[in-house]
Swiss-Prot record:
GO MF terms, alphabetically ordered: protein C-terminal methylesterase activity
Catalytic residues of the enzyme: 194, 222, 348
Reactions catalysed, as given in the entry: [phosphatase 2A protein]-C-terminal L-leucine methyl ester + H2O = [phosphatase 2A protein]-C-terminal L-leucine + methanol + H(+)
Protein name per Swiss-Prot or TrEMBL: Protein phosphatase methylesterase 1
Region span, Disordered: 20-48
Function: Demethylates proteins that have been reversibly carboxymethylated. Demethylates the phosphatase PP2A catalytic subunit.
Keyword terms, alphabetized: Hydrolase, Serine esterase
One Gene Ontology cellular component annotation held by this UniProt entry: mitochondrial small ribosomal subunit
Organism annotation: Candida glabrata (strain ATCC 2001 / BCRC 20586 / JCM 3761 / NBRC 0622 / NRRL Y-65 / CBS 138) (Yeast)
Phylogenetic placement of the source organism: Eukaryota, Fungi, Dikarya, Ascomycota, Saccharomycotina
EC number: 3.1.1.89
Annotated family: Belongs to the AB hydrolase superfamily.
Superkingdom in the source lineage: Eukaryota
Length: 386
């Protein structure tokens, strides 16, 4: 049987027999009946190394339809001198834990995106879990509100640079922001979209032994090594047809929705403005120029599929539409090495297009793979009374 036929059969069976999707009967994501075409893929002790400042203001007069505090409790800038970066972070941390386990969802966006791409998903996760969960999202280097502390230093965007950033931030966040919570109850899941999936995958091996014990899984959204590598060859065309400037934020939102780069208006209202900054003329310009990353592209996805499949933790891959698996992923799926879910009604930005369905899938993934939730009842010594 040829590889193409294997892929089609495998993806068809998974998309048509997905128990999580049954939960959505009677309630669909808005605009979920429109399939459309996908866009190119998005593309030691740390305590004294950080300085923090609250960020409750915006650097422009535009007030978006949705603001970050609708989705997260905190928006904080965290300086990491050793990385020469001030991270713009968004997070929600509960004051206590209800139950045997607290799921901690840590997100990493893809190239050209921002931490607020996960805003609507984070809110849906909170709704599904009655706010008994933790969510962390942030802007990666070269994106959104994250800045280099010393702009004169070399600014590289190799995969290892993103990985080291993510590793450093995660270790700090868990040790400082979650220190009031029982460590044994934390169940961390890394979730990466496109390039973010690659970063999450390669970060796992760098974690401390203690943190690895708390990570119960890694999830990747719409990323397949073979397809992503081929997509890089089309980036020039993508850059040519994608405007970098709009008359205002509303026009930018409208354009992205109309071109199905973000299919759900509710998600676009919070995710798209974070991709732009205002100019003196009143127009808005895109913060991230993907052309800047060109010298580093080839490092982003190399050896991803094999590395993902071989991760010594639970794994989830969610694909949009009819994306094909490559050879390593096909073999891994047939061997039961990871869970595969296909959303036929989503574009490339799964977390934006289908936030409710994605949240349900992540909650199910957590429940099935977290042994803290397993309660074994014994009938030993019990007797039946008549």
């Amino acid at each position: 049987m040829g590889d193409d036929l294997k892929r089609k059969i495998l993806l068809h069976n998974l998309s048509s027999n997905n128990p999580i999707l049954e939960k959505l009967k009677g309630g669909q994501e808005p605009n979920s009946n429109e399939e459309g075409s996908d866009s190119i893929g998005d593309l030691p002790s740390l305590k004294n190394d950080y300085k923090r400042q609250d960020n409750n203001s915006t650097n422009c007069t535009y007030i978006p339809p949705s603001q970050w505090n609708t989705y997260f409790r905190s928006n904080e800038h965290i300086k990491v001198q050793s990385r020469n970066i001030e991270f713009n972070t968004y997070y929600t941390v509960p004051s206590s834990i209800l139950g045997p386990s607290l799921p901690v969802f840590i997100f990493h966006h893809g190239a050209g995106s921002s931490g607020l791409s996960f805003a609507n998903l984070a809110r849906n996760l909170g709704d599904q879990l009655n706010n008994n969960c933790c969510c962390l999202s942030f802007d990666a280097r070269g994106h959104g509100g994250t800045k280099f502390i010393d702009a004169k230093q070399a600014q590289n965007y190799f995969r290892d640079d993103f990985v080291d950033d993510f590793h450093t931030l995660v270790e700090y966040f868990v040790s400082e922001k979650l220190k009031h919570l029982p460590t044994e109850k934390l169940s961390i899941i890394f979730i990466g979209h496109s390039l973010g999936g690659s970063i999450c995958t390669f970060t796992y091996s760098k974690l401390s032994i203690e943190l690895k014990k708390q990570v119960i899984g890694v999830a990747m959204f719409d990323i397949v090594e073979e397809a992503a590598t081929l997509a890089l060859e089309k980036v020039n065309h993508f850059l040519q047809v994608t405007p970098n400037m709009f008359s205002g934020y509303e026009e930018a939102i409208d354009w992205h929705v109309s071109h199905e780069l973000s299919r759900l208006r509710e998600s676009a209202d919070i995710a798209i403005p974070a991709l732009f900054k205002s100019t003196e003329s009143g127009k808005v310009v895109r913060i991230t120029n993907l052309e800047t990353f060109r010298p580093f592209w080839r490092t982003w996805f190399s050896d991803l599929s094999k590395s993902f499949v071989s991760l010594p933790t639970c794994k989830l891959l969610i694909l949009a539409g009819n994306d094909n698996l490559d050879r390593e992923l096909i073999i891994g799926q047939m061997q039961g090495k990871y869970q595969l879910v296909v959303f036929q009604d989503s574009g490339h930005f799964i977390q934006e297009d289908t936030p409710r369905k994605t949240a349900l899938t992540l909650v199910d993934f957590w429940k099935r793979n977290d042994n803290k939730n397993v309660v074994i009842k014994s009938n030993w010594g019990s007797s039946n009374k008549v």
